[in-house]
Design a protein with these regions (language model features):
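Alpha-helical assembly-interface signal, strongest on the long, hydrophobic N-terminal helix that forms
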Residues: 2-66
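Short amphipathic secondary-structure patches
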Residues: 46, 50-105
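Exposed boundary/loop context
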Residues: 4-6, 92, 109, 123
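Low-complexity, S/T/G/P-rich flexible repeat/linker segments used as non-globular hinges
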Residues: 107-137
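Residues embedded in well-ordered secondary-structure elements
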Residues: 33, 93-95, 117
Length: 137
């Protein structure tokens, strides 16, 4: 009886359909994750562009830079900011001389969603750079 049950092909279409649905759902989850990561990257590119624009215009990482950072934090989501310059004119004030390179890195820790109890961490980061537009005497 068990041998007849195992060799029976009556439920084959049902199993194929279930496997097909599971594969389709997994492909859909992957597509949604890729789309959300692309959207996150575009938003972070906008944030980094805003921050480097403020920093290069002022020629330093001052209150205007941190005010722009606070504004972006209110508009978007929590993220990490790293900043620096190739060479500082005055390192105590984080001032950068005209024509020197300044950079801002914005990063966000997130997870791949839709995998149930499995949490796969992903760090998305964007780096923008620009030249200081201020001459310091």
């Amino acid at each position: 009886m068990l041998k007849n049950l195992l060799s029976s092909r009556k439920g084959e279409g049902y199993i194929d359909m279930c496997v097909g649905v599971v594969v389709f759902v997994m492909i859909l989850v992957i597509a949604i994750n890729i789309f959300s990561f692309i959207t996150l990257k575009v938003e972070m590119d906008q944030i980094a562009g805003d921050l480097i624009e403020v920093a290069t215009y002022a020629g330093e990482f001052n209150e205007d830079f941190w005010n722009a950072d606070s504004y972006n934090l209110e508009q978007y989501y929590d993220y990490y900011v790293q900043y620096g310059a190739d060479e500082y004119f005055n390192s105590s004030y984080h001032r950068v001389q005209l024509g020197e390179r300044m950079w801002v890195t914005v990063s966000k820790d997130t997870y791949i969603k839709g995998l149930g109890i499995f949490r796969i961490p992903i760090t998305v980061s964007v780096t923008k750079s620009g030249l200081s537009e201020r001459y310091w005497k």
